[in-house]
Amino acid sequence: MIKNGRIVKSLAGFYDVESEGEVYQTRARGNFRKKGMKPVVGDFVEFSTEENSEGYILKIGERKNSLIRPSIANIDQAVIIMSTVSPNFSLNLLDRFLVFLEHKNIHPMIYISKLDLLTEMQEGSDKNKKTFNQLTDYEQIKSDYEQIGYDVFFDAEHLVSNLAGKVTVFMGQTGAGKTTLLNKIAPEMQLATGETSEKLGRGRHTTRHVEFFELAGGLIADTPGFSSLDYEVTNRPDLNAAFPEILRISHDCKFRECTHTHEPSCAVKLALENHEILESRYDNYLQILDEINHTRETYEKKRKKQG
């Protein structure tokens, strides 16, 4: 019998496929390996199934997006967990997550964790050092990013109400509190929680596998923590598109290929002067643009040597 469904779990070469309320254990045909393809959690598939025997995946549907770490496809939205402390909050890292998700066409949501620990802070905030130790700092960040168009949450209850009917992944810096949050809102996941290493200031990776869980009328999955974020934005137009507020304003720039760095009549730089764009966002745009240019220059030098 041929059926259609979605992979909800992958383990040791076996794939659990949900179809019409039933879950079937399947394996992939060998021809996928020959084609360099591999089914992943989230894939919509066509599979065969016989009574009292495992099924076989016959066809993988086209993916609207996918992640490599972990291997997961067809994601609607992602919750970026950013902690206030241990690890310390970073606007630069937040913007890098946002660039990553915008480029993947995954709707981002921001959840700020460990706000309760701010009361234990004795030092004040220092904008020059980019430290944020007061609740008012995060209220301002929430307001700033909501003006851009992002959803920002301080509590799990409001976050959960946005999960219905969606496939959602949870991601963030290692130790930011992803597992703690997921165990709070979906205790059936029973994820292992790792403490943050005091010596390195980084968390141990505690997420070992990927599996969809039903929650609030949607499907959710955890992802491993990231010590660093690898993104696939390799050119200025893609980077421009990954900053929604810059993309909107850039249409008014005098030059079509404006990089928003040195060109005259740049609408983005004018908006920056008028405080219509966050300085931190613009600085992070410039930093990533510089990294893209450096990577391209390095590649060109290697190619010339080889050629």
UniProtKB/Swiss-Prot annotation:
UniProt keyword Zinc present: yes
Cofactor mode of binding and number, as noted: Binds 1 zinc ion per subunit.
InterPro entries cross-referenced by the UniProt entry: G_CP_dom, NA-bd_OB-fold, P-loop_NTPase, Ribosome_biogen_GTPase_RsgA, RsgA_GTPase_dom, RsgA_N
Keyword RNA-binding: yes
Domain CP-type G: 64-229
Gene Ontology MF term list: GTP binding; GTPase activity; metal ion binding; rRNA binding
EC number(s) given by UniProt: 3.6.1.-
Pfam family, one: RsgA_N
Cofactor(s) demanded: Zn(2+)
Alphabetical keyword list: Cytoplasm, GTP-binding, Hydrolase, Metal-binding, Nucleotide-binding, Ribosome biogenesis, RNA-binding, rRNA-binding, Zinc
GO cellular component, one term: cytoplasm
Example GO BP: ribosomal small subunit biogenesis
Binding site for GTP: 113-116, 172-180
Predominant place of localization: cytoplasm
Localization (cell): Cytoplasm
Binding site for Zn(2+): 253, 258, 260, 266
Gene3D superfamilies: Nucleic acid-binding proteins, P-loop containing nucleotide triphosphate hydrolases, Probable gtpase engc, domain 3
Protein task: One of several proteins that assist in the late maturation steps of the functional core of the 30S ribosomal subunit. Helps release RbfA from mature subunits. May play a role in the assembly of ribosomal proteins into the subunit. Circularly permuted GTPase that catalyzes slow GTP hydrolysis, GTPase activity is stimulated by the 30S ribosomal subunit.
Record-stated family: Belongs to the TRAFAC class YlqF/YawG GTPase family. RsgA subfamily.
Assembly information from the UniProt record: Monomer. Associates with 30S ribosomal subunit, binds 16S rRNA.
The protein, known as: Small ribosomal subunit biogenesis GTPase RsgA
Organism: Lactococcus lactis subsp. lactis (strain IL1403)
Lineage of producing organism: Bacteria, Bacillati, Bacillota, Bacilli, Lactobacillales
Name of the gene encoding the protein in the UniProt record: rsgA
